[in-house]
Amino acid sequence: MVNFAEVLDKSLLIIMAKWHGFGRCKTRLSRDIGKTNSAKIQSVMTNHTISTAKSLQNIKLVDISIAISGLGERNCRRWSKVLGIKKFNLQGKGCLGEKMKRQIIINKKFCVQNKIKNIIFIGTDLPDLCHLDLLTTIKELKQNDLILGPSNDGGYWLIGLSEKIISKHLHLPFINIKWSKENVLQNTIDNFAFTKLKYKFLDKKLILIRLLILKIESNQLA
């Protein structure tokens, strides 16, 4: 049996998560299905993402950090403990690009101390995320500087950054992006087109919120 931890570089997996408080998450979705169901969807997807991440943590391929919005530090600590995640940080203010850059800076010392080479960012909007998605990302970061998982809405569901990028914060591809637009992925690619960075795409995935809506309407969620 292959011991992946011996042949692959360890990564820090940062999960960008939002507290699933009533009326405080998935605001656009809340208008369609109600605040209670919207909060329930957020909770289900967060728990699924955490469970998937832990499957790689258990084989020592990743350390997990959860970057939280929607709560103060004290409640973030409490929630991360409930989720079984030891390491957490507040996302802070700004656009998504600014928040991700902040997480890189905050975690830089931790990465050096723990000999972590790469940083991978994921959100909690992908119900069909599986451990193979993350394992493939870690494998591809051996040969590439940047990994992107395109989504059906013109953005991406994952971004993986190699040591070459994060060590000096050079050419961070998600800076100066107009988020929530259809060309987020293309703008990200354009940001490093002039560099010699190597990149690769993962398979395109659907942001399957609608599937969860149907399950709720059919009373299939616990």
Map each language-model feature to its residues.
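Short beta-strand/loop segment that forms part of the nucleotide-sugar
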Residues: 62-71
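Short phosphate-binding loop-to-helix
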Residues: 77-117, 178
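Conserved donor-nucleotide/metal-binding helix-loop-beta segment in metal-dependent transferases, i.e.
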Residues: 127-155
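Short, glycine-/small-residue-rich phosphate/pyrophosphate-handling segment
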Residues: 166-191
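Conserved alpha/beta core of the MobA/IspD/sugar-nucleotide pyrophosphorylase nucleotidyltransferase superfamily
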Residues: 183-222
